[in-house]
Every structure is written in structure tokens, then in C-alpha cells.
């Protein structure tokens, strides 16, 4: 359970706040916690404070339009690389899928918003990028961001480089 927070509450005006009976965490009308809000805003300092106070890095939004979104989805959607890095460092699930109609990963969210650097960051940090990754509508991230083809090409090059350098022996650094 979160302790008292020095981070100022910034729920949207005219939105109702509710306290989850299960977790005791304040949420806005979108079902977002303070960590969701600060991750979406790209407020690195506030995100760090909230995580230091015990906020759940993989908290799921419970609103009707954002069901299952994690703070990482929202940071990716906003293209906030430093916040994404901190969330991943603290254990955020890069493959978390929304539970609404789409079933998006943070990679889908970044691609949809055309946040190329966020896409590059996620792929560079191991985001799952198989040929068949799709949302529940069977759309791959490339469907939302046609500039994403480069990520598939980079993955292919990396795969080829790894297999060429390894040959039939185990991969190890040369002495």
C-alpha cells in the first residue's frame, strides 16, 4: 500500500476520484493511478518518487477505455524514453497486453502514436517483435506505424550477424 505521497495529485478537473476497495489506491475516472498519470505526462521525478514509495510498476488501468494499460503503455504512447527506461529498470512488463478490444503491447501503443524513438527503444531493449505479433484485431505494430519496417530489418540483420559470428561454436568474446 502506498504511503502518503509528496507528489501533488493531478487528477483531471471534473473527474471523480475513487479509491479501489481491493488496493486502496486512488484512481481517476479512466481507472488510472498516479503512476499512470505521471508516466503519461513524462514526469520522471514524480514517477521515481512514486516507485520509491511502492507504487506497482505493472498496475493495470481499470477504466472502460484503457482496461489493462500499464504505466509503460502510457509512457510509450507519449514517447517518454527516460520514464520508459526507469519503468523497465524497476521491472515493468514490456509484453503486457491491454485487456480491452485491442490487446496492445507498449510497442503497439508507441507505434500507433508514431513515436519512432520509443519504438526503437523498446525494440532495442528486447520487445518481442516476431513476424506474427498482432493485437486482437490481428494487426501487427507495423500496421499502425509504417515506418516500423526498419525494426524488422534491424532484427533480421542482428539475427544474421549473430548466426554468422557464432558458426557451429558457442558465442563468446574473443580474447
From Swiss-Prot:
Transmembrane stretches, start-end: none
Disruption phenotype: Normal hypocotyls length.
Record-linked Pfam families: Ank_2 (PF12796)
GO molecular function: phytochrome binding
Iron as UniProt keyword: no
Per-repeat ranges for ANK: 30-59, 67-96, 102-131
An annotated GO cellular component: nucleus
Record's keyword annotation contains Repeat: yes
Keywords: ANK repeat, Cytoplasm, Mitochondrion, Nucleus, Repeat
Assembly with partners or alone: Interacts with phytochrome A (PHYA), both in Pr and Pfr forms.
Protein name in the entry: Phytochrome-interacting ankyrin-repeat protein 1
Lineage: Eukaryota, Viridiplantae, Streptophyta, Embryophyta, Tracheophyta
Amino acid at each position: 500500500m502506498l504511503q502518503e505521497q509528496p507528489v501533488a495529485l493531478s487528477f483531471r478537473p471534473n473527474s471523480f476520484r475513487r479509491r479501489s476497495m481491493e488496493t486502496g489506491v486512488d484512481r481517476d475516472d479512466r481507472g488510472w493511478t498516479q503512476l499512470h498519470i505521471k508516466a503519461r505526462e513524462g514526469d520522471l521525478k514524480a514517477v521515481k518518487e512514486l516507485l520509491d514509495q511502492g507504487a506497482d510498476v505493472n498496475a493495470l488501468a481499470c477504466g472502460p477505455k484503457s482496461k489493462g494499460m500499464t504505466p509503460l503503455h502510457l509512457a510509450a504512447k507519449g514517447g517518454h524514453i527516460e520514464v520508459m527506461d526507469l519503468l523497465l529498470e524497476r521491472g515493468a512488463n514490456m509484453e503486457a497486453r491491454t485487456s480491452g478490444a485491442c490487446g496492445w503491447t507498449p510497442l503497439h501503443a508507441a507505434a500507433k502514436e508514431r513515436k519512432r524513438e520509443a519504438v526503437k527503444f523498446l525494440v532495442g531493449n528486447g520487445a518481442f517483435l516476431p513476424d506474427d505479433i498482432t493485437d486482437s484485431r490481428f494487426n501487427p505494430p507495423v500496421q499502425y506505424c509504417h515506418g516500423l519496417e526498419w525494426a524488422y530489418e534491424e532484427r533480421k540483420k542482428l539475427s544474421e550477424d549473430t548466426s554468422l559470428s557464432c558458426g557451429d561454436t558457442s558465442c563468446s568474446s574473443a580474447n
